[in-house]
Swiss-Prot record:
Intrachain disulfide bonds: C54-C69, C61-C73, C68-C77
Superkingdom to which the source organism belongs: Eukaryota
Chief subcellular location: secreted
Signal peptide: 1-22
GO CC terms: extracellular region; host cell presynaptic membrane
Name the record gives this protein: Delta-conotoxin-like AVIA
Keywords carried by this UniProt record: Cleavage on pair of basic residues, Disulfide bond, Hydroxylation, Ion channel impairing toxin, Knottin, Neurotoxin, Presynaptic neurotoxin, Secreted, Signal, Toxin, Voltage-gated sodium channel impairing toxin
């Protein structure tokens, strides 16, 4: 009997704790990914399209295609 009461109180406490600490979900999925949605409407706004530190055509790259903006490297960026 004591064990049943302890288990019941523990379950009620954990349930209440879950509701108290849960995030506010009134907005639902409305603002879940606002930045991604903006970038889908305007692909130029995506930071993934920007390549900082890449070399333009004609620059020496050795054998590392990641150094070229075009991702094509045969000793020089093409």
């Amino acid at each position: 009997m004591k064990l049943t009461c302890v288990m019941t109180v523990a379950v009620l406490f954990l349930t209440a704790w879950t509701f108290v600490t849960a995030d506010d979900s009134r907005n639902g999925l409305k603002n879940l990914f606002p930045k991604a949605r903006h970038e889908m409407k305007n692909p130029e706004a995506s930071k993934l399209n920007k390549r900082d530190g890449c070399s333009n055509a004609g620059a020496f790259c050795g054998i590392h295609p990641g150094l070229c903006c075009s991702e094509i490297c045969i000793v020089w960026c093409t």
